[in-house]
From Swiss-Prot:
This is Large ribosomal subunit protein bL34. One of its GO terms (molecular function) is structural constituent of ribosome. PANTHER family: LARGE RIBOSOMAL SUBUNIT PROTEIN BL34M, MITOCHONDRIAL RIBOSOMAL PROTEIN 34 FAMILY MEMBER. Belongs to the bacterial ribosomal protein bL34 family. InterPro entries: Ribosomal_bL34 (IPR000271), Ribosomal_bL34_CS (IPR020939). Gene3D superfamilies: 1.10.287.3980.
Length: 44
């Protein structure tokens, strides 16, 4: 059985990147929550 995590910089950015977060209402809520917590990094 292969491992489930097969790293890819492109897929990481597309799925979890800043622009991907801004694209949906839920993603914007995620960013707002992370800003409220004072996260240094908001997204991948």
């Amino acid at each position: 059985m292969k491992r489930t995590y097969q790293p890819s910089k492109l897929v990481r950015k597309r799925r979890h990147g800043f622009r991907a977060r801004l694209a949906t209402a839920g993603g914007r809520k995620v960013l707002a929550a992370r800003r409220a917590r004072g996260r240094k990094r908001l997204s991948a």
